[in-house]
Amino acid sequence: MGRAYQNRKESMAKTAAAKTKVYSKYGREIYMAAKAGGIDPQANLSLRGLIERAKKDQVPTHVIEKAIDKAKGGAGEDYAPARYEGYGPGNCMVIVDCLTDNPNRTFGDVRLAFTKTKCKIGTPGAVAHMFDHCAIFAFAGQDEEAVLEALMEADVDVTDIESEDGKITVFTPNTEYAKAKQALEAAFEGIEFDVDEIQFLPKTTTVVEGDDIPMFEKFLDMLNDLDDVQNVFHNAELPQE
């Protein structure tokens, strides 16, 4: 799992959008999390995790506060999640997660990115079964046995635990996110998460090579340029530079 996760992080770094896109992405997610679960980060773990990630990505405080204030006031856009699946260059598998206030527009924009790069958008569920929908927590530590024990005592369904270079990474089903985070924070006072996310991790990878590489990069760029796109997950494995 760790390798797939690292591949994704490296891919994200290469295709990171401009700052304004990052701010907009977090603004929407924070607004939706606050609207759904309340504006208090201590009571709303999803909101707290988003705020912590936004700060690590250098999102200004005023952007975060504006999104929460908008949720508090009950005003603002009515975003809904949308997910699209399909096959990218080299026949790699792709999941595109969006937040949209206009599903028809979003579908049209995402479909255009697929068709412009000779890719195929599929039906719901077309490739999702080939990914694990995981909650991921990474933090400094070496005693993975103590971590596993704390999670087991809290009745958390643990998928995997990895320990490497003084860092422990915990993988659980996405539905266990809140329970796992609460268990870790209760067991290890002052714990600071380097990673605190829900991701789709591929069960297998597809090698993308030759002429498919620039097409794949163009495909990701087109998707990441769309305001409604929040995350792009894929199983592509690119040659090491």
Swiss-Prot record:
Where is it found, in Gene Ontology cellular component terms?
A: cytosol
- At the top level, the lineage of the source is Bacteria
Which keywords fit this entry according to its UniProt record?
Cytoplasm, DNA-binding, Transcription, Transcription regulation
- Gene Ontology biological process terms in this record: regulation of DNA-templated transcription
Location(s) in or outside the cell: Cytoplasm
Which molecular-function annotations from GO does this UniProt entry contain? DNA binding
Query: According to its UniProt record, which protein family does this protein belong to?
Result: Belongs to the TACO1 family.
Q: Can you say what this protein is called?
A: Probable transcriptional regulatory protein Maqu_2154
Please tell me the species this chain comes from.
Answer: Marinobacter nauticus (strain ATCC 700491 / DSM 11845 / VT8)
